Amino acid sequence: MGKWKVGTRRSKLALTQTNWVVDKLKGFAPEADFELHEIVTKGDRILDVTLSKVGGKGLFVKEIEQSLFDKETDFAVHSLKDMPAELPDGLVIGAIPKRVDPRDVLLSKDGKTLDELPQGALVGTSSLRRSSQILAYRPDIQIESLRGNIDTRMRKLAEGNFDAIILAAAGLERVNFEGEISQFLPVEISLPAVGQGALAIECRADDEETLALLKQFDDAPTRLAVSAERSFLHKLQGGCQVPIGAYATVGENNEITLTGMVGSPDGKQMFKNTATGQDPLALGIQVAEALLAQGAGDVLAEVLRENEQ
């Protein structure tokens, strides 16, 4: 095939990521032509409600996946953290490029770190995972929902609506805003979202030509790490609307170390477990079961009940 149609969200970050992927793929297929198809998702349309209240999984991917099924696109570029743990039948992740920085970062008005923020500081985030962990570390902090693209969030900080906001390092680095970062939050304080810092290139499972192209761009250690994280998420039946975090690293002999967390939205209950192994799927299940044994299931059930109200 000389031409590939590429599905992407319309945001500045999504387009930057997709163009980066296309540039890399041109290295593997110099003669190929790539055509971007910009798609607006449910998560992009509903900006006045926190993600946990919008409900459902795959808020930023469903419409894009439909375009793959309808053969309007051949492959799509996603932030892996936006993807549900289970893909629809007929679709696969054809490539996971090498992960960039997975950490959360703090941006504050005057460069203050999390420890330096004043008592009762107002921090903006729409992520239950982030707010849970920040409140566990600094219970005095006030959390307020913050939705929108990177530019919108940074503008609200600059206008004085917040003392600080929390974003993903990867997104800021991809749009060259690293200079705005006040602090990279250690994973011990804020465990990242499943797959944070990684991209996923999704295509139809029976599209051998596209799979052959994408396979060349797959990073094996990243795939191992995020497979463990996604197995953990799948076992807990979580999406981006629940306070779940996970981060895996791959060492010698493909030994994977996975840490998983579940927290209550107020940060008063925090469950964490770390384990190592070589089978990413088994490891994810093992860490999830350890948290469920500690009582994490009750917290998740309560969050889901609140989201439905």
Swiss-Prot record:
<dbReference type="InterPro" id="IPR000860">
    <property type="entry name" value="HemC"/>
</dbReference>
<dbReference type="GO" id="GO:0006782">
    <property type="term" value="P:protoporphyrinogen IX biosynthetic process"/>
</dbReference>
<dbReference type="InterPro" id="IPR022418">
    <property type="entry name" value="Porphobilinogen_deaminase_C"/>
</dbReference>
<feature type="modified residue" description="S-(dipyrrolylmethanemethyl)cysteine">
    <location>
        <position position="240"/>
    </location>
</feature>
<dbReference type="InterPro" id="IPR022417">
    <property type="entry name" value="Porphobilin_deaminase_N"/>
</dbReference>
<dbReference type="InterPro" id="IPR036803">
    <property type="entry name" value="Porphobilinogen_deaminase_C_sf"/>
</dbReference>
<comment type="similarity">
    <text>Belongs to the HMBS family.</text>
</comment>
<keyword id="KW-0808">Transferase</keyword>
<protein>
    <recommendedName>
        <fullName>Porphobilinogen deaminase</fullName>
        <ecNumber>2.5.1.61</ecNumber>
    </recommendedName>
</protein>
<dbReference type="Pfam" id="PF01379">
    <property type="entry name" value="Porphobil_deam"/>
</dbReference>
<comment type="subunit">
    <text>Monomer.</text>
</comment>
<comment type="pathway">
    <text>Porphyrin-containing compound metabolism; protoporphyrin-IX biosynthesis; coproporphyrinogen-III from 5-aminolevulinate: step 2/4.</text>
</comment>
<keyword id="KW-0627">Porphyrin biosynthesis</keyword>
<dbReference type="GO" id="GO:0005737">
    <property type="term" value="C:cytoplasm"/>
</dbReference>
<comment type="function">
    <text>Tetrapolymerization of the monopyrrole PBG into the hydroxymethylbilane pre-uroporphyrinogen in several discrete steps.</text>
</comment>
<dbReference type="Pfam" id="PF03900">
    <property type="entry name" value="Porphobil_deamC"/>
</dbReference>
<dbReference type="GO" id="GO:0004418">
    <property type="term" value="F:hydroxymethylbilane synthase activity"/>
</dbReference>
<dbReference type="InterPro" id="IPR022419">
    <property type="entry name" value="Porphobilin_deaminase_cofac_BS"/>
</dbReference>
